[in-house]
Curated annotation (Swiss-Prot):
Gene3D superfamilies, sorted: 3.90.320.10, 6.10.140.1030, P-loop containing nucleotide triphosphate hydrolases (3.40.50.300)
Residues where ATP binds: G8, R9, A10, G11, S12, G13, K14, S15
Cofactor notes: Binds 1 [4Fe-4S] cluster.
Keyword entries, A-Z: 4Fe-4S, ATP-binding, DNA damage, DNA repair, DNA-binding, Exonuclease, Helicase, Hydrolase, Iron, Iron-sulfur, Metal-binding, Nuclease, Nucleotide-binding
Transmembrane spans: none
Classification of source organism: Bacteria, Bacillati, Bacillota, Clostridia, Eubacteriales
Gene from which this protein is expressed: addB
Protein name: ATP-dependent helicase/deoxyribonuclease subunit B
UniProt-annotated binding residues for [4Fe-4S] cluster: C786, C1106, C1109, C1115
Amino acid sequence: MSLRFIYGRAGSGKSQYCLNSIKNRIEEDIDRPLILLVPEQFSFQAEKNLIEVLDEKTGFKTQVLSFKRMAYRVFNEVGGITAKHMNESGKSMLLYNIIEDNKNNLKVFKKAAKRQGFITTISDIITEFKRYNITPEIILNNLENIEGDNLKYKMEDLALIFSQFETRLHKNYIDNEDDLTILVEKLNKSKQFDNAEIWIDEFSSFSPQEYSVLEKLLLKSYRINITLCTDYLNQGRFVDTTDVFSPIKNTENKLLQIIEDNNIKLDKPIALKCDPCARFKNSAELQHLEKNMFSFPYKEYKNETKDICMLKTLNQFTEIENTAKDIIKLCIDKGCRFKDIAVITGDLEGYENIISSVFLQYNIPFFIDKKREINNNPIIVLILSALEVLSKNWTYESVFRYLKTGLLDINNEEMDILENYVLANGIKGYQWTNDKPWEHKSFSNYELEDQALKELLAKINDIRYKAMEPIVTLNKNFKSIDKAKEFCEVLYEFLCNINLPDKIQNMIEDFKVEGEIEKASEYNQIWNIVMEVLDQIVEVIGEEKISLKEFFKILQTGFSEYEIGLIPPTLDQVMVGSITRLRSHNINTLYIVGVNDGIFPSPLKEEGILSDDDREFLGDKGLEIAKDTKSIAFEEQFLVYSTLTTPSKYLRLSYPIADGEGKTLRPSIIISRIKKIFANICEENDIVKLNGEEEELKNISSAKPTFNYLISNLRKDVEGVKIDNIWGDTYKWYLENEFWIEKLNRLIKGFDYTNQSKYIETKKIRNLYGKPLKISVSRVEKFSQCPFAYFVQYGLKAKDRKIFNLSYPDLGIFMHSILEKFSHELEKKGLEWGTMDLNWAEEEIDKLINEELDNKSLDILNSSKRYEYVTKSVKKILKRSIWLIGEHIKRGNFKPSYYELSFDIDGDYPPIAMELHSGEVINLIGRVDRVDLLQKDGATYLKIIDYKSGIKEFKLSDVYYGLQLQLLIYLDAILTELAERSGINGEPGALLYLKLDDPIVKNTVDMSDEEIEKSIIKNLKMKGLILNDPNVIRDMDNIISGISDIIPVMVKKDGGVSEGRSSVATKEEFETLRKYVRYTIIEICEEMLEGNIEIKPYKKKDGSSCDYCIYSSVCKFDTNIRGNKYNILIDKKDEEVWDAIKKKLEYKNI
């Protein structure tokens, strides 16, 4: 019985010493068991290394074990294990059930128990307790020593959960954490390790459970040799936590305590001093890094480095692209093998997709060493979404998550037809399961003939029944059961009914044929996992009564704990992984990417259920559990040391200065430390692009990425930019390669590509737009925004998918309709806006809205609680609006005369006719919300008001560019009709936008009702253009003094209008605007009919017409594509607009 330490710094040859010692023992033919004990994740590599040292005949004489393998060997030898193993999934499901049963008894975790991830947190703390040999009884016995209610109640809750978990678990099961506890007991009966010599390698620390096992082994074995990665032995002295080797020295001290307690001999240690160490014999730089990274003071390396390099990049993508180029270069120039290379990071989740994409492009074989979660696998999605459909009552999201798994007998076309119909009609809940066929006519933005409509509805119902039948049957079977095992049986029957096992097998075969071995392996494991989870539910809580929702939650919890590991498909490949999972020392070349602050070293972890203070307090009371986050942070430096000393030939550290979203990233403290040690370190960056052949050569690596660089340079050449001669030679290589020549020629032809088609034939455009042209004024404005968008919307009639929701236009139309009906009701009853009874008015608004809802004119407002709230808001807005209109009318002499005045063949006025230069007449149609009239001095003044549910400004600049024409053309048309039809001398009074809203007034505590009303009136002040006539202005606001709070006007003390602070125009200017608007509409319509469909969106300083355009995926507008340019509109001042309009009219002789 003895213990011997084999110690030395990283790379000193400790693992090799162990292997050589084993070889020597075999050659000496010593008759005792020889054991090599390593961590589980190192077992494969250790066996491989052992075989390389020993020959095939002698290799079997040594056992390579992990603690878990050792437990199984002993259990097989001495027996005693009758219970089955419960995996992490079963453990989580059991914990979920325990917490649900006891949620009302929990003092601290009652609310937390509902949070996602809580089960995992509880599972982790129970695992921790077991590893540290803490039982529920130990916790309960220590409760009286705990001060402070919060920690005491926490520990009471944990004791309750832990106690019930142990009781229910050990009826038929044990979990993985019980293995070592049982192993300690069984080792007394085992003979396997009697007089054995054991070598323990690659451990930096042990759990209390493992120390207990080691204690037993020390008492049974001949000798235990333990490797320690440290510069010197501590020999029981106090450990400085800032020492990089402090975790190792703590381990040494604990082992020394064990042998002292058991009177076990300590053999003379083996000190592996090296200069250089075996690993770094070919690199003085890496040896210097190992010695000085955590030495204080450090020794500076003055020479330029070639084995240690740094790379600073613009972002993560260019970082990985540069890494790929460097790997290719190393393999070509230095004959490096892919299997000798590793790429690691502290943020594998953030890097793995980029690495996969780039390495595939560069044809670098790689394997990402991580376990994959299974929640996104279609098989798991199908099972959970099927249950979610029933537990959440057939919501759109759950139904189509189920249908879109690709595992059902519904093709994509059928899926699209069904989904479009469901979205258009808001189908959910009972509508899926009732026996009546769906008969809603609204399933598309397009009109269909009756027969086609009937056929499509019949098809939709067929698809519906096919989609819902398996789930309806599942639901029916669920209703007659209440035990967990019965739920599992019914679910399994459902999976068989939809032929899922056969479909999975077919998919696995297809994946194998297509060479997707990883996918085949994944799907093969998933079905076994599903069966395992169902079996565990039956075994653990099979007889318990549960609801469907509980079954869904238990399954969800069970699946969430599973991760699948994949086997590397080939040996010669780059290993990609996390810094914490770096397994092999046989790595020549190591790339550490993402060496940024907060990534490597990793930041402090969250404290978890037990805070650092809790852990410290419990430790002081004798309850030793895992270290607090501060201690772990100190130990992180040993991980840094181990990582940096892994490669034997080449190390490169890289860091981006920004992430994928452009957020700034700072380099890690590791970067600055290494720069201090290596003053002339090899450092590159891709932020500043250098020119020259040497730089361009870096872009020539694998065929595919080099091809992309070639195309980029050829495009520059076409655009007249000088490129390096090297690309001419590269072009020739691809031109002579049969695989690439066709693709090369096709892309070169693409240099002439443009998405523009400025004009189409007049005949075709006539067929699309109709003849004679009948068009609304808003559509004319749409053409001014972008001719192509107009063409797609009104020519091709492309429309967005119809969805059952309430859009702003729908709501605006609804409110306009109610206001129109209310206005006519006023007229019918002989009432006036200024004198109407507000109580009656508000009741009338309620009545009109309720009638509309009863008539289902806007059925969606009856569809949910949310829309009931919207209805209430609409009522408040309209009530506020009629009050506001009444206030406006009280303040003036204009009288409302027309509501929803229409221009159309059957309208109040005929369409607005305009003659083009060709002699053709176009007809403009439209509708004015309200027209108020004022009889004054033998003239009739018009005030045209447009109701808006959003903010709308009046800008002369927009009039000039053809973006704001409606109110002016309506004014012109009404004045023309009054003169021609009735001989009335009409004059412009005002063009105004009135916002329909119920604004919130802040700080109303000290305000009277009158002050609040004034604030609302001011808040809803109308925007527009007013006649510059003080008398007419006073007829709109008879109490105006200074700035009006209802119209955009300010009057001076002398009664005149302050033109600089008002939006006004003279009669002459109104006349000019009328002429200009007519001229502009004619110009626009002629462009339209000539076939102009140019992709030319406008752009102003506050945005462009592309901002909310739904056709961007059609036009693919991109200023990098030839011919794609914005129509830049510069906001002009009013004076500039008047000058520009007058000049244009003079030029056209108008």
